[in-house]
Amino acid sequence: MAVIQFIKGINETVVADVSLTRSRDGSKGTATFRFNNPDILKSGMEDKGDITGMYLKDDEGELMTRDVSAKFINGKPQAVEAIYIIKSPQEWDRFMRFMEKYANENKLSFTKAK
């Protein structure tokens, strides 16, 4: 099972749009996650705890980033964006294993940029 959490123990049910970039030599990369109207912004969630990061959890363990921000429209939070930095080929492989599980469970597909 592959899940994303912003507050530990509370799974985000809104599926993210994920954009990936990778350096030419494959040693580094960036994954940008965008959640439109995520559960974490819904009324009553502030009682569950603070957003301390984005946690990518699966059977292998946990990946985490603290680079999480809210996007506001007319003074109201509408989206959450999180950026996960990949610093080595090993981290890239681990991240891709998580994404394969997350994609399969949420019926996502991969489209390569032209």
UniProtKB/Swiss-Prot annotation:
Any one cellular-component term (Gene Ontology): chloroplast thylakoid membrane
Alphabetical list of InterPro entries matching this protein: Psb28_c1_sf (IPR038676), PSII_Psb28_class-1 (IPR005610)
Gene3D superfamilies in the cross-refs: Photosystem II Psb28 (2.40.30.220)
Keywords: Chloroplast, Membrane, Photosynthesis, Photosystem II, Plastid, Thylakoid
Membrane topology annotation: Peripheral membrane protein
Gene Ontology biological process: photosynthesis
Compartment(s) where it occurs, according to its Swiss-Prot or TrEMBL record: Plastid, Chloroplast thylakoid membrane
Superkingdom field: Eukaryota
Main location: plastid
Similarity comment: Belongs to the Psb28 family.
SUBUNIT field: Part of the photosystem II complex.
Protein name according to UniProt: Photosystem II reaction center Psb28 protein
